[in-house]
């Protein structure tokens, strides 16, 4: 566990919890309150791990703390339960936090000069963070404009996020990742104009991110390979005169 939480593998740690949150969320909600409580803990750990992943820069870390603090306060104290406006505040901060962490990791990826496994883990984390950010955004749209989504042909009248601490509605989380990957099964549909615009934007961002990420990683790998070749060539040029001198001395002795 110490190795898992080391600074070197902080993105791998975040990726593990984000993956679990995405996959286990619909399953846990089938177990009633026990499942919801476990989901609350998993969501909290995911937020803390996301905060830890950006802890390398003090200013960025402080900004992250300011964003995540209202989420914990309103969520764990229960003040946001059944309070519409406090709920909106909490989910707005949650959406902003996921977006902030995603942008922070993207900046880190762009600044890197070599391809490492942790860089690849970080790139995958951004993809999950974008999915969760949009999932919460869809929840906000549904709260503000009831009936914005249709699930299995049934138009939602109101999703009561405020009755529990769990932020992620399994249907909208599922819809978010399906949209992000442009699978488009059609079982969950956006109906209101804001919902349609948000889903269109997510599909565009999802495809652009993959394309730009691949281009960035290929560029880094190419420059890294060229740098190694130049370094090897430089060492050969430095060592060549020394080798020739040694060979000449050996021939003289013979």
Enumerate the predicted regions with their spans.
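N-terminal membrane topogenic signal
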Residues: 1-15
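Short, hydrophobic transmembrane alpha-helix segments
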Residues: 23-36, 50-58, 80
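Outer-pore turret/helix-boundary of cation channels
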Residues: 28-33, 134-174
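Structural signature of hydrophobic alpha-helical transmembrane segments
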Residues: 30-43, 87-97
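Cytoplasmic-side transmembrane-helix entry/capping segments in multi-pass membrane proteins
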Residues: 59-69, 87-94, 117-124
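Pore-domain transmembrane helices of cation channels
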Residues: 102-148
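Pore domain of cation channels
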Residues: 166-227
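Long, low-complexity, intrinsically disordered cytosolic termini of multi-pass membrane proteins
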Residues: 235-254
